[in-house]
Amino acid sequence: MSVITYRQALRDTLRAEMVRDDNVYVIGEEIGLFEGSYKITEGLLNEFGPKRVRDTPIAEEGFVGAAVGSAMLGLRPVVELMTINFSLIAIDQIINHAAKIYGMFGGQTSVPMVIRTPGGGGQQLGATHSQNIELFYSFIPGLKVMAPSTPAEASSMLRAAIRDDDPVLFLENLGLYNSKGEVPDDYAEAENDDVATIGRAGVAREGSDITLIGYSRMATVANQVAEKLQEEEDISVEVVDLRSLRPLDRQTFVDSVKKTGSAVICEDDWLTYGIGAEIAASIQEGAFDYLDAPVRRVAMAEVPMPYAKPLETAALPGVESISTAIKETLSAVGKRVG
Amino acid sequence: MADTAKPKGGSAKASGSRRRNSRKDTSGIANENPDALLDLYRRMLFIRRFEERTSQAYTQARIGGYCHLNLGEEATVVGLMSALRETDYLYTNYRDHGYAIEKGMDPKRVMAELYGRKDGVAKGWGGSMHMYDTETRMLGGYGIVGGQLPLAAGAALAVSYRETDDVVMCQMGDGTTNIGAWHETLNIAKLWNLPIVFVVVNNFTGMGTTVDMSSAEPDLYKRGSAFRIEGERVDGRDVLAVRDAATRLVERAREEQTPFLLEAWSYRMKGHSVVDPAKYRTQEQKDEARAKENDPVAIFGDQLTKADVLSEEGREEIAASVKERVAEAADFAENSPHPDVSTLFDYTYATPVPNESRRMPADPVFAD
């Protein structure tokens, strides 16, 4: 095993897939000469040349759509959208085209493409650059949506996404690029394994008192919460990392809730109509008789994200707010008095 | 620039002067292969009758949804498709029935798609707006205005990536030249040297909004100039003119590996779709759109008759065979089975993965 950053896991895996398959190419703004806004594509232009590392004008609808069209002819584009906020410019091509072409034409042509894009608040980027709108894509049949939280997941899930024949929205996170984690030594070239499976959640940490569910950055925050509560309060938290937002692996978190009897969901998006709402609804349907307390959601404050640091910090869910929700839930259950 | 006819980009009324220039010199016909001319005529008439049958089937509720016809655009459709090789790719908007047939799809299966049947080209999943066939490389009719443009550029990018000599043709209506995808796509097509021909079928009306109402530059063929894309305008009522202009640009795109723009103007004989009575048109405009002198099938038939290529007998024979084939298509569609409901989840994903939802509306989320 070695310890690498989430960024390096993505970069090395992307490179390895480009070496493996000539049909894989990368396309997006500032990915070549500039080497990527977040340096995921560093070195690729030098190694593969401009044909396979295609810098684009600032024209998200145009280049995302062009990637879709090239995928219809069998290329396997990996699109980089500088942030998920900019996907709104390309949303017609993602939802009305990439997601529809396979079904709408009776299964004649698949669209094997990946759209890599980071979400994530907390960087003082203000209202239009701090949104987490993966929900829009998770809502759409025909798309697959993946959200890795660790370097190991980032590597194996990116590989799975590139090798999949359907359009995959691959959610990264600004706050995770520098995070480190263990990966197998041959991570970049490894064949698919269980970590990578699209449509499967994972139990990131076993526990018995309560289930804490998150994805992407919030899965890593969930692990921190679990560790802290174990140490400080002797609370045993089971952490479920969703990994795949569509398809959604309901069974994994429902099984966990059946074991623990209660659940808190932490999400970086807004609460109302958010991904947590779907998780909570699924829990009540799948584990109604096992629930000892209402399912709680910890989510962003429902405001356009402010710039000023104290306001931004207050708006975001974090270790403190999640811990509070867990302790309140367990108090209600009567297991603990928080 | 082929700019002999000069639509002012507005209502049909505003550009009525075109009619006086519309009579084509038939001398060019003498140099053409008579059988090839008759073939063009037969194909145009086929689209005319096919679309009339489609309209009828729609009003009989055999066809549902939105349904846009190529009536009045037969010369444009046939002329454009005559310029493509079988291996060239085609993307169109939702007014796609004629293109699908002309690109090589079996009309029976096109009609079956309109009927939403199992034997339809898209197995009944697409309908009128979404004809598609990988074999004939008609890569889709698209319902979102402008949506097909980036896709077509992407197909051309793949052609360029693989260094084959295919060309992509991307058809659209006049209204499309105002949407963002137009500008983004033309820019990248030129920037990346893509072998693609953009074709604007200008019938002067985007639904009910005229080109004058919507385009600050109503000479649509000029609208590639911001991207240094050469444009031409052609009389879309003239099948030979369309064929020649399209062939020239398609071959230049193939040779020079760069995009071109062709504007073909003609009349939309009926409303925007089958159900649109076109009340926004004056009687004069309606008369003009349906006038014999603007009817591409009538124009070409008369030219061929004058040139002694098409006899009265030949005309009847072609009409009878077209009628028969259209009837066959309708019969085929009528007798094709509806898609089986058990196939509902077959085309959501190409690569199966765990936890795909196969839940019917009343099913619980957890089936067991």
Where are these regions (language model features)?
Chain B
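Short acidic, gly/pro-rich beta-turn/loop elements at beta-sheet edges
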Residues: 100-102, 208, 272, 343
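Alpha-helix initiation/capping motif
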Residues: 85, 106, 116, 219, ...
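Cofactor-binding active-site loop characterized by glycine-rich and histidine/acidic residues
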Residues: 52-56, 60-192, 210-216, 221, ...
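Mixed-charge, polar/low-complexity N-terminal
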Residues: 25-26, 31, 38-39, 43, ...
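A general secondary-structure junction signal
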Residues: 94, 264-266, 348
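Conserved acidic/glycine
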Residues: 1-76, 270, 278-368
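Glycine-rich ThDP/TPP pyrophosphate-binding loop and its adjacent helix/strand module
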Residues: 138-335
